[in-house]
Amino acid sequence: MIAITGATGQLGQHVLENLLTTVPADQVVAIVRNPAKAESLSQKGVVVRQADYGDEAALTAALQGVDKLLLISSSEVGQRAVQHRNVINAAKAAGVKFIAYTSLLHADTSPLGLADEHIATEKMLADSGIAYALLRNGWYTENYLASAPPSIEHGVFIGAAGNGKIASATRADYAAAAARVIAEEGHAGKVYELAGDEA
């Protein structure tokens, strides 16, 4: 079975859409905080299990019978490393054989403050003894949506990149890559630096 954390989140929903085109629904486990939000998944035949990144025991129970896990990084900045440790420990206790993790583009060299928690998680995975792959996602195109109205109003898009360029990609694009890595064989030990095709 294949499990996805954050399955009802912005990225997780797209991953599930992709995954269900190649994997039978009854072989997919959606790990969610609020099962009420996953009712449509249950109706499709997806196995829905409740767990929170902060509850290692619940995660261990939710991961029973799971062979592969997509660990979608927590959105709680400053808490990610602790929460991800809970997931990795639970995966090990449950006998998960492979974890794909959504990290940060060039996390090992990135000057972004977010990189530290991703690097810590990558190290935990390396030390866990579980086979893993890293999906180092770049900037989400959707991150620009909040600044679209003022940009349209003033006729200029303002960003912090100076003269630099950003090759963003949509969540749907990153999700398609994640679904392939978690559904297919042969990705253990791989690091995928993912971004848009053009800056």
Model-flagged regions — what are they?
Residues M1-K37, G54-A57, Q64, S75-R85, ...:
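Oxidoreductase cofactor-interface core, primarily capturing Rossmann-like NAD(P)-dependent enzymes
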Residues V48, F98-I99:
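A short hydrophobic/small-residue beta-strand
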Residues A51, K68-I72, Y101:
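Redox-cofactor binding/interface segments in oxidoreductases and associated redox assembly factors
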Residues K37-K44, A61:
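Short loop/helix-cap segments at secondary-structure boundaries that form the rim of catalytic
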Residues S42-D55:
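Rossmann-fold cofactor-recognition segment
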